[in-house]
């Protein structure tokens, strides 16, 4: 580790546009977390800056981690891909054990640590991406086969999904499934295998929704939130009110009203609603633009990577950021049922922010020394 840190550090070697977007999103997220949470924090913790202080600590630790990670040769993660996947499996099991896993609103998604709640599903996302990149690189010539190229990934995915649904965490489960399928498709897996797996999975998804009261309520709230405006439809209705009140230019930073105990999870999953109310359509468009640039740069890094492992590692991270951002934005605007997915870099939460910044560090290391080609061009090698 010390040898890595002693190496000459040349910032110009890395993708500075990607770095700028991440710094901007993280910094803006800290400001909005304070704006969205100060009143609630003052009431519940007698400290309006309670969540601000914690998010600042998470951001500082995450930035230090990203700075270290961006200087570690990404090839190192090839050796750690399988061990880290096993670690994620162990963590997903531990979170289900009473006394170790902490329950919040009926879901066991966190492992209680001193001063911090670890969310294993966030760690699992990056661990699975590393494993997928490592395995795809290892079996490139067999990726189009069913028994050797497709089914092993489905077995791993099913184990992870089973543990996630046991928590339950449908949002993380669907995210992992989408990332896996997209990476396999990009690797050359036959489309018939993917479509077939989707047809097999569909009855199980329907069963999980129909036989779960809270999931069924979420679907009903998505289809017609006004049917129960003071119950299950309350959150999405208040979110829409926030966007409507913001108009084009917003009410002004800190001047939003929905965060005053009207909009649940205002500083976490629904932070974009607060941004929409306080900074308006312009503010939301700026956020969407920054995410677009971030994902675009990550895709360019994937295209320009010098080896298959680096290419799919960058691709997986790019897809993860894209899915999380798009799904979160769709949920808060009422286009998707609520899923419990954080908005990367912006929502309050230590696990999400730390893992996101760690993933950015990996992307930056892959980008070091690359000539990044435009998305419409050929791979730069």
UniProtKB/Swiss-Prot annotation:
It is found in: Cell inner membrane. Its EC number is 2.4.99.28. GO terms for cellular component: cell division site; plasma membrane. GO terms for biological process: cell division; cell wall organization; peptidoglycan biosynthetic process; regulation of cell shape. Keywords: Cell cycle, Cell division, Cell inner membrane, Cell membrane, Cell shape, Cell wall biogenesis/degradation, Glycosyltransferase, Membrane, Peptidoglycan synthesis, Transferase, Transmembrane, Transmembrane helix. It is a multi-pass membrane protein. The keyword Transport does not apply. It catalyses: [GlcNAc-(1->4)-Mur2Ac(oyl-L-Ala-gamma-D-Glu-L-Lys-D-Ala-D-Ala)](n)-di-trans,octa-cis-undecaprenyl diphosphate + beta-D-GlcNAc-(1->4)-Mur2Ac(oyl-L-Ala-gamma-D-Glu-L-Lys-D-Ala-D-Ala)-di-trans,octa-cis-undecaprenyl diphosphate = [GlcNAc-(1->4)-Mur2Ac(oyl-L-Ala-gamma-D-Glu-L-Lys-D-Ala-D-Ala)](n+1)-di-trans,octa-cis-undecaprenyl diphosphate + di-trans,octa-cis-undecaprenyl diphosphate + H(+). Its main location: membrane. Pathway: Cell wall biogenesis; peptidoglycan biosynthesis. PANTHER family: CELL CYCLE PROTEIN (PTHR30474), PEPTIDOGLYCAN GLYCOSYLTRANSFERASE FTSW-RELATED (PTHR30474:SF2). This is Probable peptidoglycan glycosyltransferase FtsW. It comes from Trichlorobacter lovleyi (strain ATCC BAA-1151 / DSM 17278 / SZ) (Geobacter lovleyi). The lineage of its organism: Bacteria, Pseudomonadati, Thermodesulfobacteriota, Desulfuromonadia, Geobacterales.
